[in-house]
């Protein structure tokens, strides 16, 4: 597995927490927000499925590698514990497609409601307050466009599993990273060499563009609308969304109307777009949160943001950020 580049070993206490039922649930929640159930070529050609569990354990491993602090590493492990089925699709369902944070509100409750996890925290000398919010630990998480363990992990994970970046290249990137002080004198993951930062940012920008592509935005809104209809038809509840994807899919398939809608969703192979909404066709005009990374890199003048030392990346990142999504998007089917 690509994640073994992050650290040679993890604390047994942390590994035990990863084995609890509340964490094992994340094996059945994907990283790609339901889009992987379509027949988009990018998912059809993926190396392997990418689960929230893999990402969570990888994030914990990165935090451990750079801090060797159990509290911070466990917070990294648990940061996605409240992720619902289809992940950020539920943010679209909640009207939070621009911030995509609405599902995080259950994090503390999900931890506290797991007797196995709470017992392991107590045994490790940790409290709920220590681990319920990884935002307080800057190596684990920080504000975009800074680089954190969370952003680093899903960028490398997608680079390998979706973009077919060799594991050796991931290791080359990871081994170049160190902890430095940013503009606010706060710890941040940084690159030692500009040429490695260049490789990483090309992967990161490709990912950023994909995360807000017409295909991604359309699919997430379409699936959110399908879940909304399922709730209106009393086929599922909000709590059902916090189980796992096989459970939610089984509920959709229990209703003939929703079964047809789900089967149509699974046949989406691409999208079309235009200034006018096509008549008689399901179409959406929806914006989305733009995720991007502008890492710090070591230069002869100290640490600087990569956009200040690489004009090409600065130009491409600015172009990415300028898209206003002012177009209608609809599906192409297999």
Language-model features, listed with the residues they occupy:
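Short alpha-helical catalytic segment bearing the HExxH-like zincin motif
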Residues: 72-80
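Histidine-centered, transition-metal-coordinating active-site segments
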Residues: 1-71, 85, 89-334
